C-alpha cells in the first residue's frame, strides 16, 4: 500500500508486500556495520522496519506469522531474533544546527527509555533510572552498551536518515561553519558517532545506517573505519525499489481484485518512462533497472481509485526534491564553472561523465565529481555505462527530467524569475487541442528575450535549446525529448504527446 513504512502493519493487515527478505542473508554475511544510501522515498524505512522485527529477540514467537510465507521464513538465518534493538530515526531531529544537540538528546532519550522498558528482563536491574542520570545522548549510549556486557546481551543499532541535517547545510551555506564544528574534532555529532564506534568493540554487534547523501558520512565517520558503504555494490542494487518483474506481479495481482481497463503491458508502457531506469552499480548496468517504489505505489493507488483509469498527474508531489535544496545545488554547480555547468551540460548533451564518490566533505560538494555524485545519490542521475574511463550518467526518467528542466530556469537568471503559469497553461492547452502552437512558442521566445542575460545570449544555440527544454517540460500535455532520432536524422526537441492520459489530444510536434 502507498505510504506504509511499518512492516508489521503491512503484514498484520494482510497487505500486498514485495518480498525483499532474500537480502537478509546477504546483509548478515556482509560487514557488521552497514551503510546504505538511496534517494528519498525508495523503500529504505520499510527495509529497516522489516530488519528490526526480524532480529528482535522479543518477537521470536511472531516469526512464523510475519515471515513464514516469505523467503526468509523458509530460509532463516542463524542470527534471527537474537538482538536487543535500538532504533533511531534522525528525521524527527530538528535540522537547525543551533538546536540539534538538544533535539538529538531528546530523541535518543525517548528511544533509550523505550529500550530499557521493553528489554527490562534482559538488562541489569535499575538500568533505566541510572541511565537517566547521565547527561545527553552520548553519555547515555555509552552507559547502555557497557551495562549490556553484564547480562551478555548484543545490540543491533539502526539509524534511519542519519544525514537529515545535511539538507539544511545544502540549502543554507551560512550553516557550513556550524556544521563543520559539529561534525569534526570534538563536535557533538562527531562525538556521538565516536561513541557508536566504541560500542562496536563491546555489545553493539551490528549497525544498519541509511541516508540519502554520502556527505555527512565522510565528515562523521572518517574515524569510523570499521563500517562499509554498500550503496554501489551490485548485490544490493535491487534491495530497495522495484524491478519490472516485481511491478508486473503487483499489477497482475490487483487486476484480479480491482477494476482494470488496461493490460499489464499497457500499464508498464505508461509507467516505465516515468518511474524506471535506476541503476546503482556499474556492474549491474545492462541488467535489471529499478523503478521508484513510491511512485509505482502512487500510480497503482490512483489508478485503482480512478476506477481503472490513468491518473492525470504522474508525479506525486512529495517525491520532488525540496526546492530550496536543489536551488542550492544549482548555485554550487555554477560556483565551479558557469560555462561548464553540470546541469546545463546534462540537458544539452543528455549525459555527463564522472567518478562516483562514496563520500566527500560538505565543503567540497562543488567539485565536479562530488557534485555529480551528489546528483546521483539524490536520484537525479542514473548509471548508464562507461565512457572514456569514467562513469556515464544520464537522467533516469521523466519524473526527474521534469524537475531538472524546471529548476534549470534558475540557472539562467537567479533574479526574480516569474512566469505567468495560468497564461502558459492556457497556451499549452490550445497547442494540444487546437493545434495553435505558434502562440505557445512565441510566449517562450518572449520569456527567453526578457530573462536572458547578455552572457547567456553569447552561448547561442545551446542556451536556447536548454531554455526551451526547461519551459516545455512544464507543459502537462507533452513530454519533451531532446535529440530524438527519426528517419530523417535527429529532432532538436520532440514534443511527445501523453495520449495515455489525454486520449482526445490531437497534435504532436517536432
Give names to the regions the model predicted.
Residues 1-55, 59, 64-72:
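Walker A/P-loop-proximal flanking segment of P-loop NTPase domains
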Residues 3, 19, 53-117:
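P-loop NTPase motor core
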Residues 91, 160-161, 191, 196-200, ...:
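A short beta-strand-to-loop transition that corresponds to the Sensor-1 phosphate-sensing loop
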Residues 99, 125-144:
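Short glycine-rich substrate-engagement loop in P-loop NTPases that contacts/grips substrate
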Residues 143-150, 178-205:
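Substrate-engagement module of ASCE P-loop NTPases
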Residues 151-182:
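Conserved P-loop NTPase "ATPase switch" module shared by AAA+ and STAND
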Residues 216-222, 230-301:
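Amphipathic alpha-helical segments of the small helical/lid subdomains adjacent to P-loop NTPase cores
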Residues 227, 290-510:
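Extended alpha-helical interface modules used as scaffolds for assembling large macromolecular complexes
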Amino acid at each position: 500500500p502507498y505510504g506504509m513504512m511499518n512492516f508489521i502493519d503491512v503484514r498484520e493487515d494482510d497487505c500486498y508486500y514485495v518480498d525483499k527478505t532474500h537480502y537478509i542473508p546477504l546483509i548478515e554475511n556482509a560487514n557488521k556495520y552497514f551503510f546504505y544510501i538511496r534517494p528519498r522515498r525508495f523503500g529504505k524505512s520499510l527495509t529497516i522496519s522489516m530488519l528490526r522485527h526480524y532480529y528482535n529477540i522479543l518477537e521470536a514467537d511472531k516469526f512464523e506469522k510475519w515471515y513464514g510465507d516469505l523467503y526468509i521464513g523458509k530460509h532463516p538465518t542463524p542470527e534471527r531474533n537474537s538482538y536487543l534493538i535500538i532504533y533511531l530515526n534522525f528525521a524527527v531531529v530538528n535540522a537547525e544546527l543551533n538546536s540539534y544537540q538538544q533535539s538529538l538528546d531528546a530523541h535518543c532519550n525517548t528511544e533509550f527509555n523505550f529500550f530499557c522498558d521493553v528489554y527490562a528482563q534482559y538488562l541489569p536491574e535499575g538500568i533505566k533510572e541510572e541511565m537517566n542520570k547521565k547527561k545527553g545522548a552520548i553519555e547515555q549510549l555509552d552507559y547502555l552498551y557497557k551495562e549490556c556486557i553484564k547480562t551478555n546481551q548484543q545490540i543491533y543499532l539502526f539509524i534511519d536518515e542519519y544525514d537529515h541535517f545535511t539538507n539544511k547545510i545544502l540549502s543554507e551555506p551560512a550553516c557550513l561553519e556550524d556544521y563543520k564544528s559539529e561534525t569534526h574534532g570534538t563536535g557533538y555529532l562527531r562525538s556521538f558517532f565516536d561513541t557508536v564506534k566504541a560500542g562496536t568493540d563491546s555489545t553493539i554487534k551490528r549497525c544498519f545506517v541509511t541516508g540519502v547523501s554520502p556527505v555527512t558520512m565522510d565528515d562523521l565517520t572518517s574515524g569510523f573505519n570499521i563500517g562499509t558503504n554498500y550503496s554501489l555494490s551490485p548485490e544490493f542494487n535491487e534491495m530497495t525499489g522495484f524491478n519490472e518483474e516485481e511491478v508486473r506481479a503487483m499489477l497482475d495481482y490487483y487486476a484480479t481484485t480491482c477494476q482494470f481497463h488496461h493490460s499489464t503491458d499497457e500499464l508498464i508502457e505508461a509507467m516505465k518512462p516515468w518511474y524506471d531506469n535506476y541503476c546503482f552499480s556499474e556492474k549491474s548496468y545492462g541488467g535489471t533497472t529499478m523503478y521508484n517504489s513510491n511512485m509505482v505505489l502512487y500510480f497503482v493507488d490512483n489508478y485503482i481509485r480512478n476506477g481503472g483509469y490513468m491518473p492525470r498527474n504522474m508525479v506525486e508531489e512529495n517525491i520532488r526534491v525540496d526546492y530550496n535544496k536543489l536551488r542550492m545545488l544549482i548555485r554550487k554547480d555554477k560556483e565551479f564553472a558557469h560555462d561548464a555547468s553540470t546541469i546545463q551540460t546534462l540537458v544539452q548533451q543528455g549525459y555527463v561523465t564522472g567518478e562516483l564518490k562514496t563520500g566527500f566533505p560538505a565543503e567540497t560538494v562543488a567539485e565536479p565529481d562530488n557534485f555529480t555524485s551528489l546528483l546521483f545519490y539524490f536520484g537525479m542521475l542514473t548509471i548508464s555505462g562507461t565512457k572514456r574511463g569514467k562513469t556515464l550518467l544520464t537522467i533516469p526518467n521523466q519524473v526527474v527530467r521534469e524537475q531538472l528542466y524546471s529548476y534549470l530556469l534558475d540557472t539562467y537568471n537567479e533574479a526574480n524569475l516569474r512566469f505567468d503559469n495560468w497564461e502558459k497553461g492556457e497556451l499549452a492547452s490550445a497547442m494540444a487541442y487546437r493545434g495553435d502552437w505558434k502562440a505557445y512558442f512565441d510566449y517562450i521566445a518572449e520569456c527567453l528575450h526578457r530573462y536572458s542575460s547578455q552572457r547567456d545570449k553569447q552561448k547561442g544555440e545551446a542556451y536556447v535549446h536548454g531554455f526551451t527544454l526547461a519551459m516545455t517540460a512544464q507543459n502537462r500535455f507533452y513530454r519533451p525529448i531532446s535529440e530524438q532520432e527519426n528517419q530523417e536524422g535527429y529532432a532538436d526537441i520532440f514534443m511527445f504527446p501523453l495520449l495515455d492520459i489525454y486520449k482526445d489530444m490531437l497534435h504532436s510536434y517536432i
